[in-house]
């Protein structure tokens, strides 16, 4: 169907699992499971609902007549009532007790929470796999020296693996926030039109204990520890904000990673995966653009901005509820999850297939290391050669200025080390100088830090989630 808009989050970016979570089938069958849980619980607490009625409801959880539902919604202009009528049409015996005492938000809001939990679990699975891939990458390259950058200007060397631990640490923070939200998510429960439980109190002839028990039973049947203690007709929309805040955090981390990869690609120190028939540019046939990292940045920007929808919606609710949240939430919440799913799939694909070019890293180090090594040279020549610290400092300054001019004005290579080696004031041999400028001597505790981080921070997480490891990371385009 090419004469209508289709969402690229589904056609290009998000995986099948996340698309299923936010599919009509999953949404409306969850509505029906909630209706079954309500009827079962009401029967258990003494309302006149028969086993035959319950069996009829259970038998028709997934066979949803969408055409019939669309016709009913066109008539009644109310999606929940349309599906009440649709469910009732295939469960005629149970129709009289369907949705008994409930309001629309009983199925709507509770389903939103259930789907968000399912979606967070899928995001967690992807996130753990990305962390594992980063850990493998960091371990593999923990001792590979590379130039570090501050302000994107050359700084003291680090290692490729140590840099990867920075990316992984951001994701561990995101995982911690995700786990917190999963642990604290609760259902709306069944509190009626304004959150007072009045309709259920009437059903149970004023028995407050039965109203409380009803909600507990429903929560247990739906796999939740409980409901939010108080609510209006809806659960607080701050819940949506807090959940989307987790996704925004993941997007921030992924965007930072993608920016680093794009810059490293420009430096020719890494290449992201590139298919045999892939085209980088329609005009420049030689190009290998970091398009997957660019796509991560693009989708991340969307998720970060989407958080504002949840913030504004939460702030704009009136009293016990208003409907100005509805249309926005139908779009903003699923799309945040679909986009984040796409982001993490791309992240996993890139880091698993990332090619590192040590010779290019060494080349860039060689260009800058002479300047970075001057302090070590100065100290060695004072301590081991008996040199005058001030005289040596002035000699280094003069040679550094001259070498810098040669590089910047003449486009030449950095010959600072050759100048120092040729200057008798230093008295250095080639072997001595080579040892003083060994890149590994300038990476500090990078290897130790990487090993410690992987052992103490990453390994416990991967051990906890062993069953989640092994996700595929196929990219559609």
Question: Where do the language-model regions lie?
Answer:
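Glycine-rich cofactor-pocket loops
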Residues: 139-161, 271-287, 320-327, 352-372
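Amphipathic alpha-helices that form helix-helix packing interfaces
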Residues: 38-41, 123, 127-130, 134-137, ...
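A helix-coil-helix interface module used to build multimeric assemblies
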Residues: 1-198, 206-217, 280-281, 291-295, ...
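Active-site-adjacent "gating/activation" loops or surface patches in catalytic cores
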Residues: 208-233
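Long, amphipathic alpha-helical stalk/connector segments used for oligomerization, subunit docking
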Residues: 302-387, 395
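Short, well-ordered beta-strand elements within core beta-sheets of diverse protein domains
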Residues: 162, 241-249, 376-385
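A conserved active-site cap/scaffold subdomain adjacent to cofactor or substrate pockets
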Residues: 234-269, 278-339
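Active/binding-pocket-proximal capping segment
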Residues: 271, 394-402
């Amino acid at each position: 169907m090419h004469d209508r808009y289709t969402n690229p989050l589904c056609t290009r970016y998000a995986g099948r699992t996340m698309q299923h979570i936010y599919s009509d089938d999953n949404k409306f069958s969850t509505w029906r499971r909630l209706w079954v849980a309500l009827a079962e619980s009401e029967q258990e607490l003494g309302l006149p609902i028969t086993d035959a009625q319950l069996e009829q409801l259970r038998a028709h959880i997934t066979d949803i007549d969408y055409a019939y539902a669309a016709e009913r919604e066109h008539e009644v202009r109310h999606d929940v009532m349309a599906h009440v009528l649709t469910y009732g049409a295939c469960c005629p015996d149970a129709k009289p007790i369907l949705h008994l005492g409930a309001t629309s938000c009983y199925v709507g809001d509770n389903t939103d929470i259930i789907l968000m939990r399912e979606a967070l679990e899928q995001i967690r699975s992807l996130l753990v796999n990305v962390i594992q891939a980063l850990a493998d990458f960091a371990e593999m390259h923990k001792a590979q020296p590379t130039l570090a950058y501050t302000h994107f200007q050359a700084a003291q060397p680090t290692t490729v693996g140590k840099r990867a631990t920075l990316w992984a640490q951001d994701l561990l923070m995101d995982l911690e926030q995700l786990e917190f939200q999963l642990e604290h998510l609760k259902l709306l429960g069944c509190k009626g039109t304004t959150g007072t439980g009045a309709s259920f109190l009437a059903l149970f002839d004023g028995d407050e204990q039965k109203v409380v028990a009803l909600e507990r039973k429903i929560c247990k049947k739906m796999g939740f520890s409980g409901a939010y203690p108080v609510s209006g007709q809806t659960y607080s929309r701050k819940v949506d904000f807090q959940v989307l805040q987790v996704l925004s955090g993941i997007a921030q981390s992924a965007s930072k990673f993608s920016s680093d990869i794009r810059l490293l690609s420009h430096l020719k120190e890494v290449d992201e995966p590139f298919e045999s028939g892939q085209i980088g540019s329609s005009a420049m046939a030689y190009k290998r653009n970091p398009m997957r990292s660019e796509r991560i940045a693009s989708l991340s920007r969307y998720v970060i901005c989407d958080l504002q929808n949840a913030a504004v919606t939460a702030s704009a609710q009136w009293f016990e509820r208003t409907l100005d949240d509805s249309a926005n939430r139908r779009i903003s919440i699923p799309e945040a999850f679909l986009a984040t799913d796409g982001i993490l799939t791309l992240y996993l694909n890139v880091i698993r297939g990332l090619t590192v070019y040590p010779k290019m890293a060494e080349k860039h180090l060689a260009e800058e290391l002479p300047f970075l090594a001057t302090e070590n040279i100065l100290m060695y020549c004072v301590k081991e050669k008996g040199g005058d610290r001030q005289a040596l400092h002035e000699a280094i300054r003069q040679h550094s200025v001259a070498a810098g001019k040669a590089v910047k004005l003449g486009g030449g290579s950095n010959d600072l080390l050759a100048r120092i080696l040729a200057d008798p004031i230093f008295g250095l041999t080639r072997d001595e100088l080579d040892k003083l400028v060994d890149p590994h001597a300038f990476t500090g505790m990078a290897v130790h830090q990487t090993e410690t981080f992987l052992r103490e921070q990453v390994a416990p997480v991967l051990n906890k989630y062993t069953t989640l490891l092994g996700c595929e990371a196929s990219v559609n385009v």
